[in-house]
Design a protein with these regions (language model features):
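Charge-rich, low-complexity N-terminal segments
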Residues: 1-109
Length: 109
């Protein structure tokens, strides 16, 4: 089994509506740190599990410097964003996303 990881940063704004009133319901921004983990039993014709550039471009072009509530079809919590990134990335099995130094969400298949 081959394993690779790609780390990148994404800047964006969002708000999250909850049952209780919190500061997260106001539009605010993050500089997310994202690590995408991929695996494969075989390498593609280029000798890779997946192309790191394609991972970054596919995600960043859609959410970097955007209001995530306007561009994503779901509530943009860190957990939902992590799942979406994994679903959108070939051979992905795990995504880690930090909203801040102290807050991290992980989605793993």
């Amino acid at each position: 089994m081959y394993y690779v990881s790609k780390r990148f940063e994404v800047s964006g704004a969002h708000y999250v509506t909850t049952d209780r009133r919190t500061k997260c319901e106001e539009l605010h921004g993050h500089n997310w740190i994202v690590i995408v983990h991929c695996k494969s039993l075989t390498l593609n014709e280029d000798g890779m599990v997946t192309d790191f550039t394609v991972i970054k471009q596919n995600i960043m072009s859609r959410i970097d410097h955007k209001n995530l509530n306007e561009v994503l079809p779901f509530s943009p919590t860190a957990e939902n964003i992590a799942k979406w990134i994994c679903d959108e990335t070939e051979n992905c099995y795990k995504v880690e996303i930090w909203e801040s130094e102290n807050n991290k969400a992980v989605y793993e298949i």
